[in-house]
Amino acid sequence: MKVTKKDMIYEGKGKKMWSVAEDENLLIAEFKDDLTAFNGIKKSSEKGKGALNNKISTQLFHLLEKNGIKTDLVETINDTEQVVKKVKIFPLEVIARNIATGSLTKRLGIKDGTVLPFTLVEFCYKDDDLGDPILNDDHALLLGAVKDKNELENLRQTAIKINKILKEFFATKNLKLVDFKIELGKDKDGNILLADEISPDSCRFWDAKTNEKLDKDRFRQSIGNVKVAYEEVLRRILS
């Protein structure tokens, strides 16, 4: 697919988004090597990380599409770039949790590593200045993040379905899918699509036998060998 970058319309922590000269309904997503944690307080860079996330996310989006999940991915065009559909992103981080760790254990006092009895779905308001606060359903409606309760429930059920597909897939790769956060959006026809990425930047993966962390927690917690961990996740996905 031949496309031409036009203007950079957005730069986030992990990606740059570019308009496409040939089609106003498409964008180019460029994966960066930057590493950030704690809402951008901790920063670094890992050469090759962007390319790894691009490859991992491409594989997982294809897997989800085969299982009935609509995504924004059109085509991966090189090591660090994808062509994606332009979508209007809901101002929500949608989080699905299978095992308690991270902020959940701090907020609720649940022991780290506790397997949850059901998929816990949480919504956070995307606002760095506010620290991405967690919302209940009424908060989401009050802020206009969704149009009604049915739309919010649609987001919740989409996250649950994505979790089921990924959790079962990673179990065959000797990986525990601990939790993940996703972004969902609407295309020009009003369809809800999975957007952004699914990668070790946005998921927690633990080795099924040792519970070794193979995700961005290696950066958050200064464990090291971030790129090696991401490479291992990709190797298992492709195996």
From Swiss-Prot:
GO terms for molecular function: ATP binding; phosphoribosylaminoimidazolesuccinocarboxamide synthase activity. Keywords: ATP-binding, Ligase, Nucleotide-binding, Purine biosynthesis. Pathway: Purine metabolism; IMP biosynthesis via de novo pathway; 5-amino-1-(5-phospho-D-ribosyl)imidazole-4-carboxamide from 5-amino-1-(5-phospho-D-ribosyl)imidazole-4-carboxylate: step 1/2. It catalyses: 5-amino-1-(5-phospho-D-ribosyl)imidazole-4-carboxylate + L-aspartate + ATP = (2S)-2-[5-amino-1-(5-phospho-beta-D-ribosyl)imidazole-4-carboxamido]succinate + ADP + phosphate + 2 H(+). The keyword Isomerase does not apply. One of its GO terms (biological process) is 'de novo' IMP biosynthetic process. SUPFAM superfamilies: SAICAR synthase-like. It is an enzyme of class 6 (ligase). The keyword Transcription regulation does not apply. It holds the Pfam family SAICAR_synt. It comes from the Bacteria. Its EC number is 6.3.2.6. InterPro entries: SAICAR_synt/ADE2_N (IPR028923), SAICAR_synt_PurC (IPR033934), SAICAR_synth (IPR001636), SAICAR_synthetase (IPR050089), SAICAR_synthetase_CS (IPR018236). Belongs to the SAICAR synthetase family. This is Phosphoribosylaminoimidazole-succinocarboxamide synthase. It comes from Campylobacter hominis (strain ATCC BAA-381 / DSM 21671 / CCUG 45161 / LMG 19568 / NCTC 13146 / CH001A).
